[in-house]
């Protein structure tokens, strides 16, 4: 993937506005609530019986931070996102058996959380660059599946 200087700047600037400890848990909780079948990968997380339980679940919050922390690696390695996520892709495929479509669902939920949080600070032209970035990350995470 080729990134223009403007796209790189947009992603870096947007990332600087993201509070990992806030956005990560919200994005993962949204996935688990909106797409309840994704809960099967989190059987050890305890009570995921309803939206309030998911949003108040400390393990969901902690893993949401981990997920967003991993996303930061892509921000810092935009020229080699696939290489950056090679081992993580392999883990999710071979050990965790995660359906790769779930990465797209998480990206969509993350985008919704960002749009909600940033409001007017997340106009369509910034979302377009963000969507490209998320698509590259999803592709990289899905690489070991095919």
UniProtKB/Swiss-Prot annotation:
GO biological process assignments: hydrogen peroxide catabolic process
Domain of life: Eukaryota
Tissue distribution of the protein: Red blood cells.
Gene Ontology CC: blood microparticle; haptoglobin-hemoglobin complex; hemoglobin complex
Keywords for the protein's UniProt record, in alphabetical order: Heme, Iron, Metal-binding, Oxygen transport, Transport
Record-level Gene Ontology MF annotations: haptoglobin binding; heme binding; metal ion binding; organic acid binding; oxygen binding; oxygen carrier activity; peroxidase activity
Binding site for heme b: 63, 92
Function, as annotated: Involved in oxygen transport from gills to the various peripheral tissues.
Subunit text: Heterotetramer of two alpha chains and two beta chains.
Name recorded for this polypeptide: Hemoglobin cathodic subunit beta
Species name: Anguilla anguilla
């Amino acid at each position: 993937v080729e990134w223009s200087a403007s796209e790189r700047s947009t992603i870096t600037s947007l990332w600087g506005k993201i509070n990992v400890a806030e956005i990560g848990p919200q994005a993962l909780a949204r996935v688990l609530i909106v797409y309840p079948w994704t809960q099967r990968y989190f059987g050890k997380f305890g009570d995921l019986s309803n939206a309030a339980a998911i949003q108040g679940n400390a393990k969901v919050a902690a893993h949401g931070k981990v997920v967003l922390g991993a996303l930061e690696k892509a921000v810092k390695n935009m020229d080699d996102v696939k290489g950056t996520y090679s081992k993580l892709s392999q883990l999710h495929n071979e050990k965790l058996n995660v359906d790769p479509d779930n990465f797209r669902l998480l990206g969509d939920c993350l985008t919704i959380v960002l749009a909600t949080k940033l409001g007017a600070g997340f106009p369509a032209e910034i979302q377009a660059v963000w969507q490209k970035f998320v698509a590259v990350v999803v592709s990289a995470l899905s690489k070991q599946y095919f």
